[in-house]
Amino acid sequence: MNNELRIIISGGGTGGHIFPAVSIANAIKAKRPDAKILFVGALGRMEMQRVPAAGYEIKGLPICGFDRKHLLKNIAVLFKIWKSQHMAKSIIKNFKPMAAVGVGGYASGPTLNVCASKGIPCLIQEQNSYAGVTNKLLAKKAEKICVAYEGMERFFPADKIIMTGNPVRQNVLETTITPEEARKQFGLDPEKKTIVLVGGSLGARTINESVLQHLDLVKESGVQFIWQTGKYYNAAIMEQLKGQELPMLKVTDFISDMGAAYKAADLVISRAGASSISEFCLIGKPVILVPSPNVAEDHQTKNAMALVNKDAAIYVKDADAPEVLLKKAVDTVKDEAKLASLCENIKKLGLKNSADVIADEVIKLATK
């Protein structure tokens, strides 16, 4: 028991927090197969399904964020924070972690606060170019802060920062099939130019609208499309497409093999979440970024501009997307020189082995 490595990993809410968390856990297990890893997430959020599916145990806290529009609702939020703090104490008392990792998201607040108060060393991993509220609050208590962008000393003590990049999904990096094989896998012409549209794990209304408003261009472009609508929008979209002949358009609510989808793509259209951007950098994939306006501190636009300012991506404003996005994508995918330039520049920004580097830091903290 005493020699077992016991690590808590906390946070979640979106795929952008969960994928790095699972990657870090996998890297720790690869280095220390004896490690016991416990996740702590927020009840009702995506991590409660995704983490067990990845093979790890998770405990849920009844926590949520503050409602900035309906202030009276925050009385209930304060109670949930208090209750989550008490539950976190019980979880930590029973599990006895030797180190804690926070990846952002509501649950990491009470979990790492309790760990720090008990002298358990903490590491936080900030995926974005603009630090999240939870991580900013935890920074004083963390011993190490792993980041993916330059200039993060604006938010965190410089002596704690380690530039690691963001851990990404291994299946995205390890796909060995050719682009032609990948297109065949999706039932498409192996030789035709292909655009992949993804709106994050929840879907993106404006990206979806950009296709629905320009179906004539889809039909006439000579380009084929793999379109992840998101579960929330899928039924309505399928109803709108009913009866139309669209063999060049493969529509799905969720792409399970994203590695194959990216391999099939000559160009990707995506939100500007930090994890997605890290994947595009590592695989060298030309991308048009449409940052979500519905995120804290407009951090997705800041993520996108870090690439756009280095000619490593194309930016389309969310409000403009329904009108201009699809034409810009079709024009770009037919411009070989532009694709080659985007590919070359985005590759320069990729930081490899991020999960391994972070796992090493966690193990050091746990065993010092």
Regions found by a protein language model. Name each.
Residues 56, 120-121, 266-267, 284-292, ...:
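Structural loop-to-beta junction motif characteristic of Rossmann-like glycosyltransferase folds
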Residues 338-352:
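A short, well-ordered alpha-helix in the C-terminal region of glycosyltransferases
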Residues 97-99, 263-277, 285-286:
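Acidic donor-binding loop of glycosyltransferase active sites
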